[in-house]
């Protein structure tokens, strides 16, 4: 199992994934779950994704598009249809979890279950502290991700009650 926590810890709420990674490291013994902290997703990550059964991408989302409510938690499965060749862009400076999963499938034949866990941030200004609303929501967000990890580790577990929707 791989957890990819990405964002910029020097841009306020954009660094929330790194805080999640810190919390999850205390909940899972070393070796049980691999946790990476990255500033952004890169094509090289596809190799690591190809070597696991499941990956969870953790990030701050922006409400700027109007599609998100402030401080909204979403945990979504990235569907298998997303892993086709059309998902891979020529431009690698702005990769999404879908593209990394698609690259893993295309280059390595990987079929890891993939999930996106996001929390809508409020401020992305320079700074290393989280907004009050995000600090308040963080424990619930961590609990949701921890529950997903535990269900994925249990062969008889069902993640359907833990995810908001399948993204196809």
Where are these regions (language model features)?
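N-terminal catalytic or cofactor-binding beta/alpha core of small enzyme domains
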Residues: 1-119, 123, 128-139, 144-168
């Amino acid at each position: 199992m791989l957890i990819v926590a990405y964002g910029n810890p020097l841009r306020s709420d954009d660094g929330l994934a790194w805080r999640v990674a810190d919390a999850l490291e205390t909940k899972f013994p070393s070796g049980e779950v691999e946790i990476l902290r990255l500033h952004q997703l890169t094509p090289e990550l596809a190799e690591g994704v190809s070597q696991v059964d499941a990956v969870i991408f953790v990030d701050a989302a922006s409400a700027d598009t109007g599609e998100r409510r402030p401080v909204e938690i979403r945990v979504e499965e990235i569907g298998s249809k997303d892993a086709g060749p059309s998902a891979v862009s020529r431009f690698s400076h702005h990769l999404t979890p879908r593209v990394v999963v698609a690259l893993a499938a295309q280059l390595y034949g990987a079929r890891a279950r993939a999930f996106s866990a996001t929390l809508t941030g409020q401020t992305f200004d320079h700074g290393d502290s989280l907004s009050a609303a995000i600090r308040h929501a963080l424990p619930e967000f961590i609990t949701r991700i921890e529950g997903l990890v535990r269900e994925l580790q249990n062969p008889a577990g069902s993640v359907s009650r833990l995810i908001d929707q399948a993204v196809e």
